[in-house]
């Protein structure tokens, strides 16, 4: 089953490589990564464009900043997967995540939505 992962981007040059690398390192090949830049003013778009060399990565550069909801909607319009996953550009997925999602879809007889947990990672060591 084909999965589209939509990554909305706005001024996240510090995190974007880790996000996209985590998707490209998945052991699941039947997916596309749709990166939608919401008119970033930092180097985010340039970082995203270097991933276009991968055949399953599509980068869309919006002409006007219009917020997260519109950026996700553009990603939906540009995607072609049977399932859509949103991954914020300052987040990343663990190895095997997409394959686990595919397994859940098959096991649970094609659910309409899947929600899964997350870990919080802090840059500062004084955060509890």
Residue ranges of each PLM-predicted region?
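Nucleotide-sugar donor-binding/catalytic module of glycosyltransferases
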Residues: 1-128
């Amino acid at each position: 089953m084909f999965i589209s992962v939509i990554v909305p981007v706005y001024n996240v040059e510090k995190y974007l490589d880790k996000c996209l690398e985590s998707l490209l390192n998945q052991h699941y090949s039947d997916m596309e990564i749709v990166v939608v830049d919401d008119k970033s003013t930092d180097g985010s778009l340039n970082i995203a464009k270097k991933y276009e060399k991968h055949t399953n990565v599509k980068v869309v550069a919006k002409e006007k900043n219009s917020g997260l909801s519109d950026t996700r909607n553009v990603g939906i319009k540009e995607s072609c997967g049977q399932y859509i996953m949103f991954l914020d550009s300052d987040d990343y997925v663990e190895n095997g995540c997409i394959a686990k999602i595919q397994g859940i879809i098959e096991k649970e007889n094609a659910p309409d939505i899947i929600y899964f947990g997350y870990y919080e990672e802090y840059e500062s060591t004084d955060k509890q």
